[in-house]
């Protein structure tokens, strides 16, 4: 594959100290940025941590420019939940690094919703909160990151899904996005020093503390 051959050539120049060479490598990597993860899987030898860091630094300007260009895309979607998911996907992909695309988050959320349906069927808002946040069989899928509450990683939903840790806002977002795939209306509620989800079950409105095991109040 031509792209893989080109990448093999470029990786030999990643540590070149010439600014002219670095600019040329940056342009080539930027041009193939969306295909890079696929090309990496086809390399005979994976990139070393040092090479990955070099690629990240070279792609950083292009990633920032792209973020600025696509940021307002969410405004053209219908509905507050799709808008929020698009904006969150963009932020999370930027935080997650150059290998990640915004569209990857929707795929992970689809997978999570499919697992929830396979295990719990068509759950209501209370049942879904329990599935996501309560301890069941010794397993808690998502819980509050009490040890590192202010870490920026809590705003990266790729990291939150991978680790099961998050802050109130990111955990409520997970609940809202999965709920939307179940046909549930999950809103948000600002609270002094906190953030809660808002749902209706059997005609009654509830506040849900996703950071505290999905407690209904």
Residues of each region from the PLM?
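A structural boundary/capping signal
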Residues: 1-217
């Amino acid at each position: 594959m031509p792209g893989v051959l080109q990448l093999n050539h470029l990786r030999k120049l990643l540590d070149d100290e010439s600014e002219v060479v670095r600019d040329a490598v940056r342009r080539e990597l930027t041009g193939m940025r969306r295909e890079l993860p696929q090309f990496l899987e086809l390399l005979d030898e994976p990139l070393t941590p040092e090479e990955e860091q070099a690629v990240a630094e070279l792609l950083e300007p292009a990633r920032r420019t792209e973020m600025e260009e696509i940021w307002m895309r969410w405004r053209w979607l219908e509905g507050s939940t799709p808008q929020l998911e698009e904006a969150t996907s963009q932020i999370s992909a930027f935080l997650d690094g150059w290998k990640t695309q915004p569209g990857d988050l929707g795929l992970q959320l689809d997978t999570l919703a499919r697992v929830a349906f396979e295990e719990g069927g068509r759950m209501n808002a209370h049942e879904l909160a329990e599935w996501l946040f309560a301890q069941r069989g010794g397993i808690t899928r998502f819980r509050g990151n009490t040890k590192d509450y202010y870490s920026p990683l809590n705003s990266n939903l790729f990291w939150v899904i991978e680790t099961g840790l998050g802050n109130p806002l990111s955990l409520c977002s997970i609940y809202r996005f999965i709920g939307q795939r179940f046909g549930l209306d999950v809103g948000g509620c600002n609270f002094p020093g906190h953030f809660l989800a808002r749902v209706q079950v059997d005609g009654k409105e509830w506040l849900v503390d996703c950071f505290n095991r999905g407690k209904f109040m």
